[in-house]
Amino acid sequence: ILERGESIACVIATIGTTDAFGIDNLEAIVSLRDRLANEYGLPYRPQVHADAVIGWPWAVFDDYDFPVNPLDFPPRTLRSLADARLAMRGLHLADSIGIDFHKTGYGPIASSLFLCKDHTDLKLISRDPALMPYLFQFGSHRPGVYTLETSRAGAAVLAALANLKLLGKEGYRVLLGHIVTMAEVLRAKLEKAIYA
């Protein structure tokens, strides 16, 4: 693409697939992006977006004490959680991240989040009040500037916020650890049944 003189707007890394929880290596992707941008003398840096809509909660294990294992996860679970944490270590390198609370965040649908490292990137999706005056009729609070959609209720977002506050880091660790433990139990039973 670059050799043809075309631009690359964005590179999307997957942080947790729905089937096998595959995690792309963000450190390698960002390193490759930077190397190619320098090599081709690009006057810009392509955006690196982390599609972490499923994998984001596993970031709660970033500072988990795996050697001590205070939540007493079984060995196979602990190994899986440690592997996921290791694979996600470059999440902070992404220029933007997509998060869904209705997947592994235990929130209702219609509660997603788009985070940008550089706040000026939000201007790329903002609306000009002069072009859309019906969104900006009253007061100085102007949510229509930054939202992609403006006619939805806020209940799902408040429910997601309530989950974050109620569960906290430890609550998500317990829930995710239980998911992984149950997957490991099922895997062990299947392995035993297949190879018995």
Predicted segments with their positions:
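Non-catalytic, mobile gating and regulatory segments of ester bond hydrolases
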Residues: 1-15, 28-29, 36-47, 54, ...
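Active-site C-terminal subdomain of aminotransferase-like
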Residues: 14-21, 69-196
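Catalytic PLP-binding core of fold-type I/II PLP enzymes
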Residues: 23-82, 89-92, 123-124
